[in-house]
Amino acid sequence: MEATSTAATSDKQRSSIHALPVLQDNIIWIWIKGDQAVVVDPAIAEPVKTWLQTRKLSLAAVLQTHHHADHIGGTLELLRDWPNAAVVAAADDRDRIPFQTISVRDRDKISLLNSSVEVLAVAGHTRAHIAYYLPTNKEDREDPAVFCGDTLFGAGCGRLFEGTAEDMFKALQRLCCLPAKTRVYCAHEYTEANLRWASALHPEDIAISERLVDVSSRRQRGALSLPSSISEEQRTNLFVRAQNSKELAELRQHKDQWRN
């Protein structure tokens, strides 16, 4: 599948974010401005290298949300071609992402592509999972955006491999405190499966049913369902709608055992 853009960019100095689907369901997000690119969670390197080189782009930085192999697997190979690129990752994951060059913690702010990026600690899927929030860029007239890895998915959330339901509940609530129009760039295309599960659980929910129809239509055309938005997740994501960590834990257990 070809990489797709989420912003029409007539001016090379305007930033845009592009999707590069790889493996079975991973999405590598590529944020570009001018001739510079920032790559988020490169599962593998070769498609990224080809995409950047074809467009004569230089890799400025890699953003890592967490340590899983399908998120960091391509980073070292990319660094062989762009040795000066920064690798941003959680300081608490230095033992598992030892090649990081910029170690960050919750609420840190860094500058990339002349934009401010805020780090958000969103543990749950893993103990040191982080997200990267890009506020509205007035120069680009873009909506805010968040690269959230495997914490928040389209109509879902990540499995609790290292964290607790309480961790995930707090992480999702934190993400949903971002502006409603914030675009959600998660790392896997799971939206349709998540909505099928949610619709089976709540067949009377019109918002979920309507989103499922829309997403299914997109997927049948070979299009992605992402990015989503915070407002969309607040309307149709059962994990986001959970009232407390106990309810989230019950939903997570049900989803883990569910078979379409």
Swiss-Prot record:
<dbReference type="InterPro" id="IPR036866">
    <property type="entry name" value="RibonucZ/Hydroxyglut_hydro"/>
</dbReference>
<comment type="subunit">
    <text>Monomer.</text>
</comment>
<comment type="function">
    <text>Thiolesterase that catalyzes the hydrolysis of S-D-lactoyl-glutathione to form glutathione and D-lactic acid.</text>
</comment>
<dbReference type="InterPro" id="IPR001279">
    <property type="entry name" value="Metallo-B-lactamas"/>
</dbReference>
<keyword id="KW-0378">Hydrolase</keyword>
<feature type="binding site">
    <location>
        <position position="188"/>
    </location>
    <ligand>
        <name>Zn(2+) 2</name>
    </ligand>
</feature>
<feature type="binding site">
    <location>
        <position position="150"/>
    </location>
    <ligand>
        <name>Zn(2+) 1</name>
    </ligand>
</feature>
<dbReference type="GO" id="GO:0019243">
    <property type="term" value="P:methylglyoxal catabolic process to D-lactate via S-lactoyl-glutathione"/>
</dbReference>
<dbReference type="InterPro" id="IPR017782">
    <property type="entry name" value="Hydroxyacylglutathione_Hdrlase"/>
</dbReference>
<feature type="binding site">
    <location>
        <position position="66"/>
    </location>
    <ligand>
        <name>Zn(2+) 1</name>
    </ligand>
</feature>
<dbReference type="InterPro" id="IPR032282">
    <property type="entry name" value="HAGH_C"/>
</dbReference>
<protein>
    <recommendedName>
        <fullName>Hydroxyacylglutathione hydrolase</fullName>
        <ecNumber>3.1.2.6</ecNumber>
    </recommendedName>
</protein>
<feature type="binding site">
    <location>
        <position position="68"/>
    </location>
    <ligand>
        <name>Zn(2+) 1</name>
    </ligand>
</feature>
<dbReference type="GO" id="GO:0046872">
    <property type="term" value="F:metal ion binding"/>
</dbReference>
<comment type="pathway">
    <text>Secondary metabolite metabolism; methylglyoxal degradation; (R)-lactate from methylglyoxal: step 2/2.</text>
</comment>
<dbReference type="Pfam" id="PF00753">
    <property type="entry name" value="Lactamase_B"/>
</dbReference>
<dbReference type="InterPro" id="IPR035680">
    <property type="entry name" value="Clx_II_MBL"/>
</dbReference>
<keyword id="KW-0479">Metal-binding</keyword>
<comment type="similarity">
    <text>Belongs to the metallo-beta-lactamase superfamily. Glyoxalase II family.</text>
</comment>
<dbReference type="Pfam" id="PF16123">
    <property type="entry name" value="HAGH_C"/>
</dbReference>
<dbReference type="GO" id="GO:0004416">
    <property type="term" value="F:hydroxyacylglutathione hydrolase activity"/>
</dbReference>
<feature type="binding site">
    <location>
        <position position="125"/>
    </location>
    <ligand>
        <name>Zn(2+) 1</name>
    </ligand>
</feature>
<feature type="binding site">
    <location>
        <position position="150"/>
    </location>
    <ligand>
        <name>Zn(2+) 2</name>
    </ligand>
</feature>
<feature type="binding site">
    <location>
        <position position="70"/>
    </location>
    <ligand>
        <name>Zn(2+) 2</name>
    </ligand>
</feature>
<dbReference type="InterPro" id="IPR050110">
    <property type="entry name" value="Glyoxalase_II_hydrolase"/>
</dbReference>
<keyword id="KW-0862">Zinc</keyword>
<feature type="binding site">
    <location>
        <position position="71"/>
    </location>
    <ligand>
        <name>Zn(2+) 2</name>
    </ligand>
</feature>
